[in-house]
């Protein structure tokens, strides 16, 4: 995993590699320019055309909460394409959530750290990507994780 990586830049994505090669290249260019420590993929309107309605609702609700409640530098924390340099890696390894919202915790920590720079990178999906439905149990677990992150906001 990331802890064992010795490359100057790390990228990670979803298991099914749903993003275009151009999206990955653009994200990598943001990091190799040495202007940013973290590059976070962000979904556009076309992305949501491929997502089942309930999943779209949950995604947009979380995006609104992260932007409004947590005031993160990148409100779209759940796009599964991100990258970082050594400074970002250190922050990534300090996360404690090991489920879906680990991305949110990572972006939260980056947004609160004045020594770390982060940039959003618009992404595109590959054609023929299919999304699975979300189980209700996952939502309850992740709601607890969101509350944990929310209370870290006051420390």
Per-region residue spans from a language model:
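Short aromatic/hydrophobic "clamp" motif used to bind/position activated sugar donors
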Residues: 10
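Acceptor/aglycone-binding surface of glycosyltransferases and processive sugar-polymer synthases
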Residues: 1-4, 21-100, 127-144
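C-terminal catalytic/acceptor-binding lobe
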Residues: 115-155
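The conserved acidic donor/metal-binding loop of glycosyltransferases
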Residues: 14-19
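Catalytic donor-sugar/metal-binding loop of nucleotide-sugar-dependent glycosyltransferases
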Residues: 73, 98, 107-126
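Conserved residues at the C-terminal ends of beta-strands
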Residues: 13, 42, 124
């Amino acid at each position: 995993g990331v802890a064992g990586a010795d490359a100057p830049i790390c990228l990670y994505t979803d298991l099914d590699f749903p993003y275009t090669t151009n999206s990955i290249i653009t994200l990598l260019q943001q990091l190799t320019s040495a202007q940013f420590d973290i590059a976070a993929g962000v979904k556009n309107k076309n992305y949501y055309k491929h997502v089942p309605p309930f999943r779209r609702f949950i995604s947009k609700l979380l995006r609104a909460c992260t932007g409004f409640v947590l005031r993160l530098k990148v409100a779209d924390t759940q796009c599964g394409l991100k990258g970082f340099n050594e400074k970002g890696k250190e922050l990534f390894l300090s996360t404690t959530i090991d489920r879906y919202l680990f991305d949110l915790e990572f972006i939260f920590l980056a947004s609160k750290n004045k020594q770390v720079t982060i940039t959003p990178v618009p992404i595109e999906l590959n054609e023929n990507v299919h999304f699975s439905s979300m189980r209700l149990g996952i939502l309850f677990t992740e709601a607890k994780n969101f509350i944990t992150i929310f209370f870290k906001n006051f420390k």
